[in-house]
């Protein structure tokens, strides 16, 4: 699942690693010193965070019972607070719990050169549960950790409750059919039908009018052509009559010319016959 390896160098804890080891530090008293998860060097008596829940050498059983009762009460309070939290905060607190538990394991990890400690099998669930219980602060000595996500004993139960609350089915309302809407639908359908009928009739009438106009144009064109033909024929006949009249006039003039010629010849012959008789007398 998760593999936690202690880094070779820790930047934010450099002032602890650069100094001397814990065993070589001088202290005014001979009591046993221990190191908590916040890297605070304290005496055997603990007053904050997880230190109150750790076992003391030579402690009494009554104190352990009171501590367990305080843990249960703090867990109940934390559960009630977590129910009111949104899902995003639960996710962030879950990640914070994982990081803090990993820091606790780093404190307990072996020194440099040892093998990497792996959390596999049945141990991860127990270690994480113990880590959550140890990090839970008492209600009297709350330093900000009691209300955090480290006091969650079973994340599955909390996540199940929150998801059940958030994923409630939305109420679906079935639309009721009103008679007014039906009447309006019927009226709209009838109106659409009437509009379509009127449009079709108007289109048909327009087509008929266009056809009539075309027919009238064709008739007018035919009549115009016939009138033009008749006018042309009349003009031709008039020309023919004029030609005939001209021919008749020419014929008459020719006849008069012939008559005049005959008379002239006659007069000429009659005058030639008279002249020799006079000479003979």
Swiss-Prot record:
Keywords: Coiled coil. InterPro entries: DUF4653. Residues 1-12 have a biased composition (Polar residues). It holds the Pfam family DUF4653. Residues 198-257 form a coiled coil. Residues 179-190 have a biased composition (Acidic residues). Residues 45-74 have a biased composition (Basic and acidic residues). Residues 92-102, 147-161, 169-178 have a biased composition (Low complexity). It comes from the Eukaryota. Residues 1-197 are annotated as: Disordered. Belongs to the UPF0500 family. This is UPF0500 protein C1orf216 homolog.
